[in-house]
A protein has these predicted regions:
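Conserved short histidine dyad/triad with adjacent acidic residue
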Residues: 61-68, 72, 76-93
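Short glycine/proline-enriched turns and hinge-like loops at secondary-structure junctions
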Residues: 91-94, 135-137
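Short hydrophobic/aromatic patch on the recognition helix
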Residues: 271, 275, 323-324, 328
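Conserved hydrophobic/aromatic beta-strand scaffold that supports enzyme active sites
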Residues: 70, 78-80, 100-101, 122-124, ...
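Generic hydrophobic, amphipathic alpha-helix propensity
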Residues: 239-240, 287-292
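Alpha-helical bundle regulatory/interaction domains
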Residues: 2-63, 109-251, 256-258, 262-268, ...
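Short, conserved glycine- and acidic-residue-centered signature motifs
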Residues: 93, 236, 288
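Short, conserved beta-strand element in jelly-roll/cupin
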Residues: 93-109
Length: 352
């Protein structure tokens, strides 16, 4: 792995593959870890999830096989865990975190905090909550643990919601099929994309974009769908103009929708409606266009990070390489590799 250390450990009961960037690295390189674990020992499976204090007890007879795929960076931990036997799980996530989970597949109904859980449910633990989870055979779940204070601040500043009040003391949510499927797809997309391109996580901009994506996804899946307050047209024009000024003043940075909401003091929905009415485009597409142009500028003026399409894209917050290539070609009519190749060819010709 480029710029990372890789360790492969094999044991009779577990195979663990981990990759990480050391905490001591500075500059634009950010610490992260990626782990894949296959266990045939239930205690080792319980201990595999980084930062959690767990006890697993096998409840059905037969050889246990469990798997874990985990990403951790900044204040975000994203994982997918599978087990073939029924298990009772108890314990706590890492201190100060809000954890949510969405089942992908199960042979029968699970129980979380004593409540029945199927694939149409989302489960959650707050910072002071303890895990009490009975999982059936053939269980497959996506989990996300994120700093609770950061989540509450994001919900308050960007979404204008009190997410702590939304969660309350509830441990099981039924968000509805559409919202839950969207949340599930979002988490799976991140895991699968970074499995193919884990070095994208070494860039702080990528981590920042992913963190805000995860924060927004959690708020969206559990928050009630309340109507956004009406904003007068002149106010919307001012919001859009101010947003554009802010983006242009920080053209070298990866600005996100959350940054705009905080800077302008408006909710995500107000920003969305304002851009749609004034420009006929949503702020996400507008920001993506600005970032694509930023990547193209780097290709045209190559520095150390322009040595590869993958690294340059990741430095601008494009963590999904396939989506980036598609968006880039749609925007500029050529592949990013073609732009970079043209630039290198021109530099060679211009050389005396």
């Amino acid at each position: 792995m480029d710029g990372c250390t890789a360790v492969l450990m094999d044991a009779a009961s577990a195979a663990t593959e981990t990759s990480a960037v050391p905490e001591a690295w500075g500059g634009d390189v950010a610490p992260f870890s990626v782990a894949r674990v296959t266990s045939t020992d239930i205690e080792e499976q319980a201990a595999s999830l980084n930062g959690w204090n767990q006890v697993y007890e096998q409840m059905t007879p037969g050889r246990f096989v469990g798997k874990l795929h985990e990403l951790r960076f900044s204040g975000v931990q994203l994982f997918r865990e599978t087990s073939n036997q029924a298990v009772h799980e108890s314990g706590t996530p890492w201190a100060g975190s809000r954890a949510v989970g969405v089942p992908i597949e199960m042979d029968s109904t699970a129980r979380f905090g004593g409540q029945p859980v199927d694939t149409d449910a989302l489960v959650t633990l707050g910072p002071a909550d303890e895990l009490d989870f009975y999982t059936p055979r053939g269980f497959d779940i996506l989990g996300l643990a994120i700093d609770a204070d950061v989540l509450e601040a994001h919900a308050r500043q960007v979404e204008h919601r009190d997410i702590a009040a939304v969660f309350g003391t509830r441990c099981v949510f039924k968000p509805g099929t559409v919202r839950l499927n969207e949340f599930r797809r979002s988490l799976l997309s991140v895991l699968q994309s970074l499995d193919a391109n884990p070095t994208a996580l070494q860039f702080r901009q990528t981590q920042r974009v992913l963190e805000q994506t995860m924060l927004g996804a959690v708020v969206a899946v559990v928050a009630d769908e309340a109507a956004a307050p009406e904003v007068a047209n002149p106010r919307r024009r001012h919001i859009v103009d101010s947003a554009k000024d802010f983006m242009r003043s920080r053209i070298a940075e990866t600005i996100t929708v959350a940054d705009l909401c905080i800077e302008l003091g408006v909710s995500r929905r107000t920003l969305q409606y304002s851009f749609q009415e004034v420009l006929g485009i949503n702020p996400i597409r507008f920001l993506r266009a600005m970032r694509l142009n930023g990547v193209r500028r780097d290709f045209k003026n190559p520095g150390p990070l322009a040595s590869s399409v993958q690294d340059t894209a990741a430095n601008w917050g494009f963590w999904h390489l396939g989506h980036f290539v598609t968006d880039y070609k749609r925007m500029f009519g050529e592949l990013p590799s073609e732009t970079l190749r043209h630039t290198r060819r021109s530099a060679t010709v211009a050389r005396p």
